Amino acid sequence: MKNKLPPFIEIYRALIATPSISATEEALDQSNADLITLLADWFKDLGFNVEVQPVPGTRNKFNMLASCGQGAGGLLLAGHTDTVPFDDGRWTRDPFTLTEHDGKLYGLGTADMKGFFAFILDALRDVDVTKLKKPLYILATADEETSMAGARYFAETTALRPDCAIIGEPTSLQPVRAHKGHISNAIRIQGQSGHSSDPARGVNAIELMHDAIGHILQLRDNLKERYHYEAFTVPYPTLNLGHIHGGDASNRICACCELHMDIRPLPGMTLNELNGLLNDALAPVNERWPGRLTVDELHPPIPGYECPPNHQLVEVVEKLLGAKTEVVNYCTEAPFIQTLCPTLVLGPGSINQAHQPDEYLETRFIKPTRELITQVIHHFCWH
């Protein structure tokens, strides 16, 4: 029953107090099971049907889908349950204790983005879900901060096709309709070690990598010349060489060299297209030195994302907020949810506070966020 639902600030406090860190390092990684249980119980109290799904390939992580209403279409409100690890010693407050001070709510996940679920629950307190004319779905995902495994799995397996979706990442309540993607690769070259006094008896992996880097930088120039999206502050795909390591001694021919790089593609560029461009760029090295160069993913790739600017969702949200949609350079789960329905990224708090010590959400976002959630539910589920 709704009268069992705690006050807004107590919901927020309980979410922050329930650790759900995701990390590639196993020692830091945590299950989100306790947080999912909290959310599931609250949405059941509001009259929602709740389904909890294990996410394959994760360390005991779960998605939750809460649904009410019948028929096709409707609205999906989505967010992730996990946070990044916190920097021990750099926080001046307990990351897992919600603390209010000087118009700010402090705690790990206040902005990015456990708080969004507190806003949804509080807004639904005054909504009679039995009278919805179209379905309302609430999706809570796992591992957004690492592999985005939760959103990927949901998009791959669900039969739902809502009319539209909103992901409540911290955008300072400025609607976002597009962002770049992210691809990160390891380029590895296997040479042949030997004594440096006789270079002909070995194959120097550093020299081969030098050749490969030249072709990769040509690809970077080609991407900049060929692809443009003027709405972005950096209106072309970027390519960065971020890490390199090779060899072990000055008097030894280098046997192995490894380069880490990333590409941030524009919306509309497919992952297959980018992989093809990279492989084509490195083809001369492979032809000259067959079998010595490999390209491997460092992290699962994220495509670029764009919601059609003329979609009803964009028009409605722009009218409600009195603000035009924007494009951003960071990544979200939107590319995966967008495969199901037109999607906007829109939520309280600033991205500038995400992943920072003493993360906070300004209390000035409380009233307009609650009003916005209520308005979009009324528009897309009652009309």
Curated annotation (Swiss-Prot):
The lineage of its organism: Bacteria, Pseudomonadati, Pseudomonadota, Gammaproteobacteria, Enterobacterales. This is Acetylornithine deacetylase. One of its GO terms (cellular component) is cytoplasm. It is found in: Cytoplasm. GO terms for molecular function: acetylornithine deacetylase activity; zinc ion binding. Belongs to the peptidase M20A family. ArgE subfamily. Homodimer. Zn(2+) 1 binds at residues 80, 112, 169. The gene is argE. Catalyzes the hydrolysis of the amide bond of N(2)-acetylated L-amino acids. Cleaves the acetyl group from N-acetyl-L-ornithine to form L-ornithine, an intermediate in L-arginine biosynthesis pathway, and a branchpoint in the synthesis of polyamines. Zn(2+) 2 binds at residues 112, 145, 355. The active site is at residues 82, 144. SUPFAM superfamilies: Bacterial exopeptidase dimerisation domain (SSF55031), Zn-dependent exopeptidases (SSF53187).
